[in-house]
From Swiss-Prot:
Domain observations: The Q motif is unique to and characteristic of the DEAD box family of RNA helicases and controls ATP binding and hydrolysis.
One GO BP annotation of this record: rRNA processing
Cysteine disulfide partners in this protein: none
UniProt record similarity statement: Belongs to the DEAD box helicase family. DDX48/FAL1 subfamily.
Ranges for domain Helicase C-terminal: 234-392
Binding site for ATP: A66, Q67, S68, G69, T70, G71, K72, T73
Record-given protein name: DEAD-box ATP-dependent RNA helicase 34
GO terms for MF: ATP binding; ATP hydrolysis activity; RNA binding; RNA helicase activity
Gene source species: Arabidopsis thaliana (Mouse-ear cress)
Length: 392
């Protein structure tokens, strides 16, 4: 079923007095940044950009929430390009992300939108040479996009100077502030100036995360979507009833023969399942690539580049790929396994239908998974229908 909302009718729980700005031209950006925005392919700001960009540019702390695929990463990049003082080669913005892939994507987006400004951004992520990080930081960069562990390591070494940092962005903050990364976030935060501007940007913001923001945000502007309104425009959602786990593979092969797939991502719940399914598909003469967190960074980068450049059309992945990766040609997302919790669902299926394009999400469901499917429907206030036999 298509998402119950279109972007024009999203209802935002927005701080009083924050009005949408319908044109980038009216946001007070300098001409070089504005040119970069239009060159990047935007014609008008998305709903979340209309509300969040100006408060960020005015120096307010901001909590911004919108569904996946509405330009949150670009919103970060635009803010970074506008805020930094290009004449000073000191780090002025830190963007922290939960995965290496998202941190790299953010760095690339900053460089693309800031192409006319001479902005220098660098991705500080694990899996790459510490020596290269140190050299790049010592030469001077305006913005750092990274994972918390590597960023804090660079701060401790003295290679990343924080005195000039004026903006901290926590991207996918629900994941960032979860149990695994919370302490690292606080380590970085304590090394920053006391008057630091903080922005949290995410597709989901559970109540306990919002409560935690009180510790390091001052009178934040809130731009929020209610959980029961957080459905996805332009994505048709279906399930396929499979009686047994071993029948999923045959079902997947059948879909290959029926559907017109531009590009697809197939999600599994474990790295072991990703490897098993990849081998099974290849042994049946299907051309697929795979991605999970155990792969070396260079291999992950190569796989990403092949998928982005359309050299690879089908990717089998674990949830390392579920957050924040902009591949705008993905037409289908297949949940070979139903995600372990409802909040992962929106991140997975948000890979299809990016920026208003139509997409299809198909969920393989055993009888024991039906409760989880119903939980997802309740969580997002949506209906996932059984896939019709004539879907092409």
């Amino acid at each position: 079923m298509e998402g119950t909302l279109d972007e024009e009718n999203l209802v935002f729980e927005t701080t009083k007095g924050i009005k949408p700005i319908k044109s980038f031209d009216d946001m007070g950006m300098n001409d070089k940044v504005l040119r970069g925005v239009y060159d990047y392919g935007y014609k008008k700001p998305s709903e979340i950009q209309q509300r969040a960009l100006v408060p960020i540019l005015k120096g307010r702390d901001v909590i911004a929430q919108a569904q996946s695929g509405t330009g949150k990463t670009s919103m970060i990049a635009i803010s970074v390009c506008q805020i930094v003082n290009i004449s000073s080669r000191k780090v002025q913005v830190l963007v922290l992300s939960p995965s290496r892939e998202l941190a790299s994507q953010t760095e690339k987006t900053i460089q693309a939108i800031g192409a006319h400004t001479n902005i220098q951004a660098h991705a500080c992520i694990g899996g790459k040479s510490i020596g290269e990080d140190i050299k790049k930081l010592e030469r001077g960069v305006h913005a750092v996009s990274g994972t918390p562990g590597r960023v804090y390591d660079m701060i401790k070494r003295g290679s990343l100077q924080t005195k000039a940092v004026k903006l901290l962005v926590l991207d996918e903050s629900d994941e960032m502030l979860s149990k695994g990364l919370k302490d690292q976030i606080y380590d970085v935060y304590r090394a920053l100036p006391h008057d630091i501007q903080v922005c949290l940007i995410s597709a989901t913001l559970p109540q306990e995360i919002l409560e935690m923001t009180e510790k390091f945000m001052t009178d934040p502007v809130r731009i929020l979507v209610k959980p029961d309104e957080l459905t996805l425009e332009g994505i048709k959602q279906y399930y396929v009833d499979v009686d047994k786990e071993e029948w999923k593979f045959d079902t997947l092969c059948d879909l290959y023969g029926r559907l017109t797939i531009n590009q697809a991502i197939i999600f599994c719940n474990t790295r072991q399942k990703v490897d098993w399914l990849t081998e099974k598909m290849r042994s049946s003469n299907f051309i697929v690539s795979s991605m999970h967190g155990d792969k070396r960074q260079k291999e992950r980068d190569d796989i990403m580049n092949q998928f982005r450049s359309f050299k690879s059309r089908v990717l089998i992945a674990s949830d390392v790929w579920a957050r924040g990766i902009d591949v705008q040609t993905v037409s289908h997302v297949i949940n070979y396994d139903i995600p372990n919790n409802p909040e992962l669902y929106i991140h997975r299926i948000g890979r299809a239908g990016r920026f208003g394009r139509e997409g299809v999400a198909i969920n393989f469901v055993k009888s024991s998974d039906m409760k989880d499917l119903k939980d997802i429907e309740r969580h997002y206030g949506t209906k996932i229908r059984e896939m019709p036999a004539d879907l092409v």
